[in-house]
Amino acid sequence: LHTAAFVSSNNNDTFGPWPVREGLCTLEMHRDLPIDLQVRHLFATRMIDDVMIGNAYASEEELEACSKINPGILTFGIELDKELTEVEYEILYYKENHANRGDVSEYMARSSAPRGTFANESIQKANAVDMKRGDVVILNDEYSRYKGVLMVSNRWEAGITPGRGSPSPN
């Protein structure tokens, strides 16, 4: 079954097929979000094949942002808590692209590809805090075997910090 969904431009004075000025997105949760985030979210669900803009006219900036999206690659924005070292930057924006390991965990997505590339680099401990959903971490020198692994938390229990084991399921 081929599926499609609508996203909304946030450009001023857009319009649709009827007198509605609040946008015409399929998912209410997308209202007022940047258009590229709406599109990336729909593709990330893996339930939508085509995405259409439901109101006219999207701005040139919105169209350009959408044109850069590859439906087959999950991308998301990151807000940094600290300035990255050169090695951390290279791991985060790994040129080979990140891929979730085959031994999937319900608690995190793990990309171990950078581990081999950066095995001889030092990654100092920084910002070790309890994790919450959506946090991105790079394992450091204290976890030498896993140093350089990039993790994105899907679900984490209070009191758990990276490298101290996964909590048992509830």
Predicted regions mapped to residue ranges:
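Catalytic alpha/beta core domains of metabolic enzymes, predominantly
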Residues: L1-K82
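C-terminal functional modules
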Residues: E83-N170
